[in-house]
Amino acid sequence: AVMPEGQGIWPALWILGSNHFQVGWPTCGEIDIMEHYGCDDDHIHSTVHNNMYNWNGGIPPTSYSAYVNATSGFRIYEVEWNEDELKFYVDGEYLGTYFKTNSGWQQWPYDQDFHIILNLAVGSHFMPCGTENNLFPEKLEIDSSTTLSIKSLKIS
């Protein structure tokens, strides 16, 4: 994927628990394969949200970040997901691993159905730099999205 640039642009490639409407966020679980703030051209984040680690009064989410040339060419964002860990990569370079612990479902809701969301948002209270009014049009370019196995997703 090639990330757009511009103050207030917020592309994300993520996975959300399919029971979101029944149990709500963050109980459903969220895996951000990649998030990017358009005002920070080369900085991307891979983040794990759940009932224990979240921005709703829990412990701040576990996040891995990297400085890559996100806006100037296609990059491959990847999560390897198995029953005990989530490993994050950009262009094959390892970012970090989130491990299942003995804390139960509050720390590991990742043993249920999830669905993929590829989106480009504009503005948010999470934006570190505000939003420009004259940055449009913008686009998030995705060459392909591949599910390698039932719990492994690769987006490029």
Where does each model-flagged region fall?
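GH16 jelly-roll
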Residues: A1-S156
